[in-house]
Amino acid sequence: DGGIQWVRQQVASGVDVTTVVEKGKAAFIGPELYKKTLGVIGLGAIGSLVANIALSLGMDVYGYDPFLSVDAALRLDRHIHVVKDINELYKRADYITIHIHYTKDTERMIDAKAIGAMKRGVRFINLARGEIVDDDAMLAALDTGWVAAYVTDFPNNRLVGAPHVLAMPHLGASTPESEQNCAVMAVDQLRDYLENGNIRNSVNLPAVSQERSGVCRLCLIHKNVPAMLASI
Protein backbone atom coordinates (compact mmCIF):
# COMPACT_ATOMS: atom_id res chain seq x y z
CA ASP A 1 0.00 0.00 0.00
CA GLY A 2 2.86 2.38 0.79
CA GLY A 3 4.38 1.93 -2.65
CA ILE A 4 1.05 2.47 -4.39
CA GLN A 5 0.41 5.60 -2.35
CA TRP A 6 3.86 6.94 -3.24
CA VAL A 7 3.21 6.45 -6.97
CA ARG A 8 -0.14 8.23 -6.69
CA GLN A 9 1.48 11.19 -4.96
CA GLN A 10 4.21 11.45 -7.58
CA VAL A 11 1.76 11.27 -10.48
CA ALA A 12 -0.49 13.86 -8.86
CA SER A 13 2.52 16.17 -8.53
CA GLY A 14 3.39 15.80 -12.20
CA VAL A 15 6.55 13.77 -11.55
CA ASP A 16 7.79 11.35 -14.22
CA VAL A 17 7.79 8.20 -12.08
CA THR A 18 9.70 6.14 -14.64
CA THR A 19 12.61 8.59 -14.64
CA VAL A 20 12.70 8.79 -10.84
CA VAL A 21 12.67 5.00 -10.47
CA GLU A 22 15.45 4.48 -13.02
CA LYS A 23 17.58 7.14 -11.37
CA GLY A 24 17.06 5.65 -7.92
CA LYS A 25 17.99 2.09 -8.88
CA ALA A 26 21.66 2.77 -8.25
CA ALA A 27 20.97 3.03 -4.52
CA PHE A 28 19.94 -0.63 -4.43
CA ILE A 29 22.92 -2.24 -6.17
CA GLY A 30 24.27 -5.20 -4.21
CA PRO A 31 26.24 -8.43 -4.70
CA GLU A 32 24.65 -11.57 -6.11
CA LEU A 33 24.18 -14.70 -4.02
CA TYR A 34 25.47 -17.02 -6.76
CA LYS A 35 28.82 -18.60 -5.81
CA LYS A 36 28.85 -16.82 -2.47
CA THR A 37 29.24 -18.76 0.79
CA LEU A 38 26.39 -18.96 3.27
CA GLY A 39 26.82 -20.03 6.88
CA VAL A 40 23.74 -21.44 8.60
CA ILE A 41 23.82 -21.59 12.40
CA GLY A 42 21.17 -24.06 13.55
CA LEU A 43 20.08 -26.88 11.23
CA GLY A 44 16.65 -27.67 12.59
CA ALA A 45 13.42 -27.55 10.61
CA ILE A 46 13.98 -23.98 9.40
CA GLY A 47 17.77 -23.95 9.17
CA SER A 48 17.93 -27.12 7.08
CA LEU A 49 15.30 -25.73 4.71
CA VAL A 50 17.25 -22.47 4.32
CA ALA A 51 20.47 -24.40 3.70
CA ASN A 52 18.91 -26.55 0.97
CA ILE A 53 17.31 -23.56 -0.76
CA ALA A 54 20.58 -21.61 -0.67
CA LEU A 55 22.35 -24.56 -2.26
CA SER A 56 19.80 -24.58 -5.08
CA LEU A 57 20.60 -20.88 -5.67
CA GLY A 58 24.21 -21.78 -6.38
CA MET A 59 25.66 -20.89 -3.00
CA ASP A 60 28.32 -22.83 -1.15
CA VAL A 61 26.69 -23.71 2.17
CA TYR A 62 28.27 -24.41 5.56
CA GLY A 63 26.13 -25.46 8.51
CA TYR A 64 26.75 -25.66 12.24
CA ASP A 65 24.56 -27.37 14.83
CA PRO A 66 26.04 -29.20 17.83
CA PHE A 67 22.62 -30.76 18.50
CA LEU A 68 21.88 -31.91 14.97
CA SER A 69 19.21 -34.61 15.06
CA VAL A 70 19.12 -37.64 12.79
CA ASP A 71 15.92 -36.42 11.13
CA ALA A 72 17.43 -32.99 10.43
CA ALA A 73 20.62 -34.54 9.08
CA LEU A 74 18.62 -36.68 6.66
CA ARG A 75 16.88 -33.55 5.36
CA LEU A 76 20.18 -31.91 4.42
CA ASP A 77 21.56 -32.13 0.90
CA ARG A 78 24.81 -34.11 0.84
CA HIS A 79 26.66 -31.13 -0.67
CA ILE A 80 26.17 -29.01 2.46
CA HIS A 81 29.31 -28.81 4.60
CA VAL A 82 28.41 -29.52 8.24
CA VAL A 83 31.22 -28.29 10.50
CA LYS A 84 31.89 -29.11 14.14
CA ASP A 85 33.70 -25.84 14.87
CA ILE A 86 31.62 -22.68 14.45
CA ASN A 87 34.80 -20.69 13.77
CA GLU A 88 35.21 -22.69 10.56
CA LEU A 89 31.85 -21.29 9.45
CA TYR A 90 32.71 -17.77 10.61
CA LYS A 91 35.91 -17.52 8.59
CA ARG A 92 34.35 -18.81 5.35
CA ALA A 93 30.90 -17.24 5.16
CA ASP A 94 30.03 -14.14 3.12
CA TYR A 95 26.53 -14.33 4.60
CA ILE A 96 25.50 -15.79 7.95
CA THR A 97 21.95 -16.62 8.98
CA ILE A 98 21.04 -17.87 12.44
CA HIS A 99 18.15 -20.20 13.32
CA ILE A 100 18.45 -21.29 16.95
CA HIS A 101 16.39 -21.07 20.12
CA TYR A 102 16.92 -18.27 22.62
CA THR A 103 18.18 -19.66 25.93
CA LYS A 104 20.55 -18.48 28.64
CA ASP A 105 23.34 -20.26 26.76
CA THR A 106 22.60 -18.49 23.46
CA GLU A 107 21.97 -15.03 24.91
CA ARG A 108 24.34 -12.59 23.14
CA MET A 109 26.01 -15.54 21.45
CA ILE A 110 26.91 -13.21 18.59
CA ASP A 111 29.16 -10.88 20.56
CA ALA A 112 32.31 -8.92 19.73
CA LYS A 113 34.47 -12.06 19.86
CA ALA A 114 32.19 -13.99 17.50
CA ILE A 115 31.92 -11.07 15.08
CA GLY A 116 35.69 -10.63 15.14
CA ALA A 117 36.09 -14.23 13.96
CA MET A 118 33.93 -13.55 10.89
CA LYS A 119 35.14 -12.37 7.50
CA ARG A 120 35.37 -8.64 7.00
CA GLY A 121 32.33 -7.48 5.03
CA VAL A 122 30.06 -10.29 6.20
CA ARG A 123 26.31 -9.78 6.00
CA PHE A 124 24.45 -11.13 9.03
CA ILE A 125 20.79 -12.18 9.12
CA ASN A 126 18.97 -12.72 12.42
CA LEU A 127 15.45 -14.10 12.11
CA ALA A 128 15.73 -16.16 15.30
CA ARG A 129 15.60 -13.93 18.40
CA GLY A 130 16.89 -10.43 19.03
CA GLU A 131 18.58 -11.35 22.30
CA ILE A 132 20.96 -13.74 20.54
CA VAL A 133 22.88 -10.81 19.03
CA ASP A 134 24.74 -8.24 21.12
CA ASP A 135 23.47 -4.95 19.67
CA ASP A 136 26.46 -2.96 20.97
CA ALA A 137 28.93 -5.29 19.26
CA MET A 138 26.91 -5.42 16.05
CA LEU A 139 26.52 -1.64 15.77
CA ALA A 140 30.24 -1.16 16.45
CA ALA A 141 31.10 -3.68 13.71
CA LEU A 142 28.74 -1.96 11.29
CA ASP A 143 30.37 1.38 12.08
CA THR A 144 33.83 0.06 11.19
CA GLY A 145 32.63 -1.86 8.13
CA TRP A 146 33.60 -5.24 9.56
CA VAL A 147 29.94 -6.21 9.13
CA ALA A 148 28.58 -4.84 5.85
CA ALA A 149 24.91 -5.22 6.71
CA TYR A 150 22.66 -6.53 9.47
CA VAL A 151 19.17 -7.83 8.73
CA THR A 152 17.00 -8.37 11.78
CA ASP A 153 13.43 -9.35 12.43
CA PHE A 154 13.56 -7.71 15.88
CA PRO A 155 13.76 -3.92 15.57
CA ASN A 156 14.36 -1.67 18.55
CA ASN A 157 15.03 2.04 19.04
CA ARG A 158 18.78 1.61 18.52
CA LEU A 159 18.56 -0.46 15.35
CA VAL A 160 15.78 1.36 13.50
CA GLY A 161 17.36 3.97 11.27
CA ALA A 162 20.94 2.85 11.98
CA PRO A 163 23.20 2.77 8.89
CA HIS A 164 23.44 -0.61 7.14
CA VAL A 165 20.63 -2.11 9.26
CA LEU A 166 17.50 -3.54 7.64
CA ALA A 167 14.95 -3.92 10.44
CA MET A 168 11.69 -5.69 9.67
CA PRO A 169 8.57 -6.21 11.79
CA HIS A 170 8.20 -9.70 13.25
CA LEU A 171 5.38 -10.70 10.92
CA GLY A 172 6.25 -14.25 9.91
CA ALA A 173 3.21 -15.77 11.61
CA SER A 174 0.85 -12.81 11.43
CA THR A 175 -1.93 -14.36 9.36
CA PRO A 176 -5.21 -15.89 10.53
CA GLU A 177 -4.18 -19.23 9.02
CA SER A 178 -0.82 -19.37 10.77
CA GLU A 179 -2.35 -18.46 14.14
CA GLN A 180 -4.76 -21.39 13.79
CA ASN A 181 -2.05 -23.73 12.53
CA CYS A 182 0.20 -22.87 15.49
CA ALA A 183 -2.60 -23.64 17.94
CA VAL A 184 -3.39 -26.96 16.26
CA MET A 185 0.30 -27.92 16.15
CA ALA A 186 0.75 -27.17 19.86
CA VAL A 187 -2.27 -29.28 20.81
CA ASP A 188 -1.18 -32.15 18.54
CA GLN A 189 2.32 -32.22 20.01
CA LEU A 190 1.05 -32.04 23.59
CA ARG A 191 -1.39 -34.88 22.94
CA ASP A 192 1.35 -36.95 21.29
CA TYR A 193 3.51 -36.49 24.39
CA LEU A 194 0.75 -37.37 26.86
CA GLU A 195 -0.45 -40.40 24.91
CA ASN A 196 2.81 -41.72 23.44
CA GLY A 197 5.69 -39.99 25.22
CA ASN A 198 7.01 -38.47 22.00
CA ILE A 199 8.77 -35.11 22.22
CA ARG A 200 8.88 -32.78 19.23
CA ASN A 201 10.26 -29.25 18.87
CA SER A 202 11.26 -29.00 22.53
CA VAL A 203 13.69 -26.28 23.61
CA ASN A 204 14.97 -27.98 26.78
CA LEU A 205 14.53 -31.71 26.09
CA PRO A 206 15.92 -33.99 23.36
CA ALA A 207 13.64 -35.15 20.56
CA VAL A 208 11.99 -38.51 21.25
CA SER A 209 10.03 -40.36 18.58
CA GLN A 210 9.46 -44.09 18.97
CA GLU A 211 6.65 -46.31 17.86
CA ARG A 212 4.83 -48.29 20.52
CA SER A 213 5.93 -51.93 20.75
CA GLY A 214 3.50 -52.90 23.50
CA VAL A 215 0.96 -51.58 25.95
CA CYS A 216 3.46 -49.57 28.01
CA ARG A 217 6.85 -47.96 27.56
CA LEU A 218 9.45 -46.89 30.09
CA CYS A 219 11.54 -43.79 29.45
CA LEU A 220 14.55 -42.77 31.56
CA ILE A 221 16.15 -39.36 31.06
CA HIS A 222 19.61 -39.11 32.59
CA LYS A 223 23.01 -37.56 32.08
CA ASN A 224 25.48 -39.46 29.91
CA VAL A 225 27.24 -41.05 32.89
CA PRO A 226 28.83 -44.53 32.53
CA ALA A 227 26.97 -47.34 34.35
CA MET A 228 24.05 -45.05 35.20
CA LEU A 229 21.38 -47.45 33.92
CA ALA A 230 23.01 -50.41 35.67
CA SER A 231 22.73 -48.63 39.00
CA ILE A 232 18.99 -48.00 38.69
Protein language model features and the residues they cover:
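Phosphate-binding beta-alpha-beta segment of Rossmann-like dinucleotide-binding domains, i.e.
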Residues: 1-37, 201
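A conserved regulatory-domain signal marking ACT and ACT-like small-molecule sensing domains
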Residues: 200, 204-232
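Aromatic pocket-lining residues of Rossmann-like dinucleotide-binding sites
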Residues: 53-54, 118
